[in-house]
């Protein structure tokens, strides 16, 4: 299966401009099975407009994502500000299948309070879905700093993590190392989609979108575009046979 992470600048609060950019990049980089969009790809962290976007733009954006997935016959995932069933605002990653049907929703568990996410409701569960033989789970940005979340999911035999982010350039070393570590320690693939460019507050973003595997980074970039590659279950199996860390885990020790 070929998976690609879209890496793009985001115009904060400009939904239509961001949607057009996604269309352009999907057109330019056709041929993959699965595409992943950055965290809050339609709005950025323009918090003053989040409520308006959640109520007036997100429903149409979800329909548009569904239509794009069906039209292009791809799996398409990314995160948006929206409301949950209780009416609370959440940072939600959604994925649509090749027929445009909603497959899964994941609400960000670890909220990044310094960026104003405190008024959002944190997620309570990470669902695992299966696509073409690959078991897939999800993370959003700050989640990467919490290895126990990824390990608990990996123990349920996850083959691919999809992680979206708006990770700043000043901490790009941490991003690359954390993405690689989550893939290496859990002997799986991790597809990362991060933002590039600057936001309306002049914050620069790190890029590094791409594919990370059980032996480390496979491909990543700091440029606009789509980055990833072919993933193979046989390669994962081979890596897990060389170093069988799951069978050799020692539990019950009082460290």
Task: Set out the residue ranges of the language-model regions.
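Short polar catalytic/cofactor-binding loops
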Residues: 7-13
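Cys-nucleophile CN-hydrolase/nitrilase-fold catalytic domain and related Cys-dependent amidase chemistry
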Residues: 15, 23-98, 105, 168-184, ...
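Active-site catalytic loop in hydrolytic enzyme cores
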Residues: 84-156, 170-177, 237-255
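CN hydrolase (nitrilase-like) catalytic-core segments centered on the catalytic cysteine
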Residues: 57-77, 145-228
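Hydrophobic residues at beta-strand termini and immediately following loops
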Residues: 6, 53, 106, 129, ...
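Extreme N-terminal starter segment of soluble prokaryotic enzymes
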Residues: 1-5
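Short, acidic/polar
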Residues: 17-27, 145-151
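Structural motif
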Residues: 33-34, 136, 160
């Amino acid at each position: 299966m070929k998976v690609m992470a879209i890496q793009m600048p985001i115009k904060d609060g400009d939904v239509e401009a961001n949607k057009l950019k996604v269309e352009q990049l999907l057109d330019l980089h056709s041929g993959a099975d699965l595409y992943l969009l950055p965290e809050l790809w339609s709005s950025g962290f323009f918090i003053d407009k989040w409520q308006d976007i959640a109520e007036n733009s997100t429903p149409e954006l979800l329909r548009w994502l569904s239509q794009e997935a069906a039209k292009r016959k791809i799996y398409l995932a990314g995160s948006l500000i929206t409301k949950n069933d209780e009416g609370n605002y959440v940072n939600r990653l959604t994925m649509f299948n090749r027929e445009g049907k909603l497959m899964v929703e994941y609400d960000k568990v670890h909220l990044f309070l310094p960026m104003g996410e405190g008024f959002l409701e944190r997620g309570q569960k990470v669902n695992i879905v299966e696509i073409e033989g690959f078991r897939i789970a999800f993370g959003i940005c700050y989640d990467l700093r919490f290895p126990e979340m990824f390990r608990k999911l990996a123990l349920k035999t996850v083959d691919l993590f999809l992680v979206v982010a708006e990770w700043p350039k000043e901490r790009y070393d941490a991003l690359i190392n954390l993405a690689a570590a989550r893939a290496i320690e859990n002997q799986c693939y991790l597809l990362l989609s991060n933002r590039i460019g600057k936001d309306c507050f002049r914050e620069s973003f790190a890029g590094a979108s791409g594919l990370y595997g059980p032996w480390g980074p496979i491909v990543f970039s700091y440029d606009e575009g789509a980055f990833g590659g072919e993933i193979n279950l046989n390669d994962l199996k081979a890596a897990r046979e060389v170093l069988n860390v799951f069978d050799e885990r020692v539990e019950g020790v009082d460290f």
